[in-house]
């Protein structure tokens, strides 16, 4: 009887050991993949430069001041975090033909991050409020003066205007921080996206597109400035 109990205990300990080993092995493999990915894209260096650009920028305060005389729920401000956002972009096919747009680009973080890390043709931000737009333009000037980023900065541009009326015809990849977009604005934007023939991929936060032209293909959690939300990647249906 004692031998049976000892054998059973030994067996259970062995199973527990194998489970722990597999979990640790899986974690190590994941960390190795992340390290390889970061090294391949030179992310540590890009992240350091990105924080030099934006370390003294308070986009929330700039937005609050800009919205004093014009405010609505869709103007509530939020920002990307560099590494989580670049990881999100790695889930879509970005190449030298990609024209990236950020609708509601604020101080330009998503636009700058995209152009710094990926070989896009263009990286463009559209912002409604002049104060935020001006800040983004200043970050671009600062980036252009940094060693190794002259060519990347040439791909970046910022447009002061309403994303419901600005020309989006060349966009192939669009990012929308859509967490606070509702009602007529959200419906109008979905209608616009449907009419863009070059557009192949749309990334939204917190909710999916309400469109028959785009199919949801991936859902992932992403760290944003206000917390963790779901990001949704949509592809145009053929």
Where are these regions (language model features)?
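Conserved SAM/SAH-binding beta-strand->alpha-helix loop
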Residues: 129
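S-adenosyl-L-methionine
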Residues: 5-96, 133-168
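Conserved S-adenosyl-L-methionine
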Residues: 116-122
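Glycine-rich SAM-binding Motif I of class I
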Residues: 108-112
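Conserved class I S-adenosyl-L-methionine
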Residues: 97-106
């Amino acid at each position: 009887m004692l031998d049976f109990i000892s054998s059973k205990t030994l067996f259970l300990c062995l199973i527990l050991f194998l489970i722990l080993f597999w979990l640790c092995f899986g974690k190590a493999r994941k960390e190795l993949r992340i390290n390889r990915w970061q090294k391949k894209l030179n992310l540590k260096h890009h992240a350091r430069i990105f924080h030099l650009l934006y370390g003294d920028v308070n986009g929330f305060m700039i937005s609050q001041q800009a919205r004093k005389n014009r405010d609505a729920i869709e103007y509530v401000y939020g920002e990307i975090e560099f590494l989580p956002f670049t990881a999100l972009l790695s889930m879509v096919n970005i190449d030298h033909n990609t024209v990236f747009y950020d609708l509601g680009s604020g101080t330009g973080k998503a636009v700058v991050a995209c152009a710094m890390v990926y070989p896009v043709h263009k990286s463009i931000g559209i912002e409604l409020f002049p104060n935020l737009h001006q800040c983004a333009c200043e970050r671009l000037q600062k980036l252009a003066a940094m060693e190794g980023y002259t060519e990347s900065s040439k791909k970046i541009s910022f447009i002061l205007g309403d994303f419901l009326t600005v020309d989006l015809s060349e966009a192939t990849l669009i990012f929308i921080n859509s967490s606070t977009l509702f009602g007529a604005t959200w419906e109008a934007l979905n209608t616009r996206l449907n009419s863009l023939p070059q557009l192949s991929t749309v990334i939204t936060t917190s909710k999916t597109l309400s469109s028959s032209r785009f199919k949801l293909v991936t859902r992932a959690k992403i760290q944003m400035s206000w917390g963790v939300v779901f990001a949704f990647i949509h592809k145009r249906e053929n």
